[in-house]
Regions:
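N-terminal Rossmann-like dinucleotide-binding module
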Residues: 32-85
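Bacterial N-terminal signal peptides that target proteins for export
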Residues: 7-20
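Hydrophobic residues in well-ordered beta-strands that form the structural core
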Residues: 44, 132, 157-159
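Bacterial N-terminal signal peptides
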Residues: 19-29
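A contiguous active-site-proximal alpha/beta segment in oxidoreductase catalytic domains
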Residues: 137-185
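Beta-loop-alpha module in the N-terminal Rossmann-like domain of NAD(P)-dependent dehydrogenases
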Residues: 86-149
Length: 185
C-alpha cells in the first residue's frame, strides 16, 4: 500500500485544521471589529509549540496581519525567522515591548503552558484577546486568575482544542450562523 492516500488525507486535515482554528478562534473577536473586512492584527507569544506552523506556515488569506512574534529564546526566534521568512522587525524578546509597539488585537500563545498566565497578565490590561493552546493552565489557581483577568478587562480568552478542527464543528458553526439553526444570536 502506498503512502500517497495517507499523505493526501493528512494534508487535507492540516488545511482543515488551519482554517478551523481561525474560524473558531477569531470569530468572536472579529465580530467586534467595526469593519468586518479588516484583518485582525495578530501577534504570537511563544514559539515552542508545534501548532505555530498553523499561523506562520498558513497561506495568506487576508483575515489577519502578523504584527509581532515573541519568544525569550534567541535561538528559537532565529530558527523560526529563517524557516518562515519573518521580517526581523517583527521579532521581539520582550512581550510587553512587543504588545506596546505593535498593538495587536489578538495574541496566540504557542509557548509553554507555564507561560499562559504571564501572557494573559500582559495582554488583558491592554484589552488584547488571547488564545492559548490546551490545556488552559497548569493549575486551577492559574486558570482562575486568567478567568478573572479576562472578565475584568473584557477580553476573549480561548483555548485551542483539537475538536475545533473536526468537520462536524465546521458544519455546526455553519448551521448556527448561516442557517439560523438556533435562531438569531
Amino acid at each position: 500500500m502506498s503512502g500517497k492516500p495517507a499523505k493526501k488525507t493528512n494534508m487535507k486535515i492540516q488545511s482543515l485544521k488551519m482554517t478551523l482554528v481561525f474560524v473558531l478562534t477569531f470569530f468572536i473577536a472579529n465580530s467586534v471589529l467595526s469593519d468586518e473586512n479588516k484583518p485582525i492584527r495578530l501577534a504570537v507569544a511563544g514559539m515552542s509549540h508545534g501548532h505555530i506552523s498553523f499561523i506562520l506556515g498558513r497561506p495568506a488569506k487576508g483575515d489577519f496581519e502578523l504584527v509581532g512574534v515573541f519568544d525569550t529564546s534567541r535561538v528559537l526566534t532565529q530558527n523560526v525567522k529563517v524557516r518562515y521568512g519573518l521580517a526581523p522587525e517583527i521579532i521581539y524578546h520582550n512581550l510587553e515591548k512587543m504588545l506596546d509597539e505593535v498593538k495587536p488585537e489578538a495574541v496566540v500563545a504557542f509557548g509553554s503552558i507555564f507561560d499562559h498566565l504571564m501572557v494573559v497578565e500582559a495582554c488583558a490590561p491592554r484589552g488584547i484577546h488571547v488564545m492559548v493552546e490546551k490545556p488552559l493552565a497548569v493549575s486551577m489557581e492559574h486558570a482562575k486568575r486568567m478567568a478573572e483577568l479576562a472578565e475584568k478587562h473584557q477580553i476573549f480568552l480561548l483555548t485551542d482544542y483539537e475538536t475545533s478542527w473536526y468537520p462536524t464543528t465546521a458544519q455546526s458553526l455553519k448551521m448556527v450562523h448561516k442557517d439560523g439553526f438556533v435562531g438569531k444570536l
